[in-house]
Design a protein with these regions (language model features):
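Glycine-rich oxoanion-binding loops at beta->alpha junctions
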Residues: 48-106, 146-153, 157, 359
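Short glycine/serine/threonine-rich phosphate/pyrophosphate-binding segments
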Residues: 12-23, 46-47, 91-92, 103-119, ...
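Short, acidic/small-residue loops that bind anionic groups at enzyme active sites
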Residues: 31, 121-145, 199-206
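C-terminal non-catalytic interaction/assembly regions of soluble proteins
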Residues: 256-359
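N-terminal phosphate-binding or glycine-rich loops at protein starts, especially the Walker A/P-loop
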Residues: 1-50
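Accessory alpha-helical/coil subdomains and C-terminal extensions
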Residues: 97, 108-110, 116-120, 148-166, ...
C-alpha cells in the first residue's frame, strides 16, 4: 500500500490540476494499491485535518482545467511557527495529520513561501516532494515554473489588444503586468507583444529616460507607445533609498495611486503632454486553461515526482534544468528568489531591438 498526500498552496495559477494529475497517473499506473489524500485549501487542510480521499475519477478531465480542485489559501511562512488564535501549534498539527494518515509522502505544489514551509516540514522529518508553481517564474533552481507561460500568453494577448486601440487614438498606453518582486512575466510578455518600453523591478527606471523613449518614437512618426510595466517597477531615486525610507515611500505611493502604473502615467503626462491610459489585466493572468507548454511541463514534472516517490527519494523539488527534468534538493533552493539579471540575454536582445527599460 502506498499512501500520498497532495496540497496546493498560495496564489492559484494554470496547470495545478494538470500537475496533480501527472503525479497520480504516474503512480496509479505503477502501483497496485494507492491511496491519495487531498488536503483542502492548502496548508489549512493539513493543519486542521481537512482532507478527502481522491480516486482516479477525480483526475479525469482536469488536464485542461484551471484553478485547483483542492482549493488554496495563503499561509505565510513567517507565521508557521506562531500558534493560531486557539493556541494550536501549526507545525505539530501538520506533522500529526501526516502521521495519523500514515502517509508515505506529501506532494506540495506552490511558490516561494509554500516551498519554505515544505522545507520546514522536510526538516521536521516528513517525506516531502515540492513542485514549483507560479506565474512569476521566480523559483530558484528551475528554469521554468508551471503557470508562467500560460500567464505570458494572457498578458501578451492583453497588450496585443491594446495595440489596436493605442494606434487608432494616438495614445500612450501602460499595461500593468503581475510581478511585485521580479519581472520575468513583464519581460516575456513585453517582448512577445512588441512593447516599446518594459519596466521591471530589477532595472530601476528613470522617468526622464522613459519620456525620452516616447518622444523619440513621436519624432520618428509613431504617434502611440506601449509600455509593459511590472506592478513592482521602481524609480531609480526610490531604489536608492534605505530600506525603512523606501517602505515609507511605497506606502505614500499606495495611498495616492491605485498602483505604480498610475504614478508613472501621471508623470509621463506632465512631462510630455500626451494622453495616457492605464490597463490592468490583474488576476486574469492567473486564470483559464493552461497553455500546451504548461500541460506538457506539468505532466513531465508530475511524472518525475511519481518516480521519486516510487524510488523512495524524498526532500526534493522537481524542476526543469537546461531542458531536462531534474531533482533539486529542497534545502538548496528553499528561500532563494530567481530574479532577472539586468544583463540577461533577453534584456540585452530586447534593448538591441530598440526596447527601452528606462535605464
Amino acid at each position: 500500500m502506498l499512501r500520498i498526500g497532495l496540497l496546493t498552496s498560495g496564489g492559484d495559477c494554470q496547470a495545478l490540476n494538470a500537475t496533480m494529475r501527472g503525479v497520480v497517473k504516474g503512480l496509479a499506473n505503477n502501483v497496485k494499491d494507492l491511496e491519495v489524500y487531498g488536503f483542502m485549501n492548502g496548508y489549512k487542510g493539513l493543519i486542521y485535518s481537512d482532507y478527502r480521499m481522491l480516486s482516479a475519477k477525480d483526475f479525469s478531465g482536469i488536464l485542461t482545467q484551471g484553478g485547483t480542485i483542492l482549493g488554496t489559501s495563503r499561509q505565510p511562512f513567517k507565521l508557521m511557527r506562531t500558534p493560531d488564535a486557539n493556541g494550536l501549534d501549526k507545525v505539530e498539527a501538520m506533522k500529526h495529520t501526516y502521521h495519523k494518515l500514515l502517509l508515505d509522502c506529501l506532494v506540495i505544489l506552490g511558490g516561494n513561501g509554500t516551498q519554505k514551509t515544505a522545507n520546514l516540514l522536510r526538516e521536521e522529518g516528513l517525506n516531502i516532494i515540492h513542485l514549483p508553481k507560479t506565474i512569476d517564474n521566480d523559483i530558484w533552481g528551475t528554469d521554468m515554473t508551471f503557470g508562467f507561460y500560460s500567464a505570458v500568453n494572457i498578458a501578451t494577448d492583453a497588450i496585443d489588444c491594446i495595440h489596436t486601440t493605442a494606434s487608432s487614438h494616438n495614445r500612450v498606453f501602460i499595461v500593468e503586468v503581475m510581478g511585485h518582486k521580479v519581472g520575468w512575466l513583464t519581460l516575456y510578455a513585453g517582448i512577445a507583444s512588441g512593447a516599446d518600453v518594459i519596466l521591471i523591478p530589477e532595472i530601476p527606471y528613470d522617468i526622464e529616460k522613459v519620456c525620452e523613449a516616447i518622444n523619440k518614437r513621436k519624432e520618428r512618426g509613431s504617434e502611440f507607445t506601449i509600455l509593459a510595466v511590472a506592478e513592482g517597477a521602481i524609480a531609480k531615486e526610490d531604489a536608492a533609498l534605505p530600506k525603512k525610507e523606501l517602505k515609507k515611500r511605497q506606502e505614500e505611493i499606495a495611498k495616492k495611486y491605485p498602483s505604480v502604473s498610475y504614478k508613472i502615467a501621471e508623470e509621463i503626462e506632465a512631462k510630455t503632454g500626451m494622453e495616457i491610459r492605464v490597463t490592468v489585466p490583474g488576476h486574469m493572468q492567473r486564470g483559464g486553461s493552461p497553455c500546451p507548454y504548461d500541460r506538457v511541463l506539468s505532466t513531465r514534472l508530475g511524472s518525475e515526482a511519481a518516480q521519486l516517490i516510487l524510488d523512495k527519494q524524498y526532500g526534493y523539488m522537481v524542476g526543469m534544468v537546461n531542458g531536462k527534468v531534474k531533482k533539486i534538493p529542497l534545502g538548496e533552493c528553499a528561500g532563494k528568489l530567481k530574479t532577472v539579471d539586468p544583463n540577461a540575454q533577453e534584456v540585452l536582445q530586447a534593448k538591441r531591438m530598440g526596447i527601452s527599460f528606462g535605464d
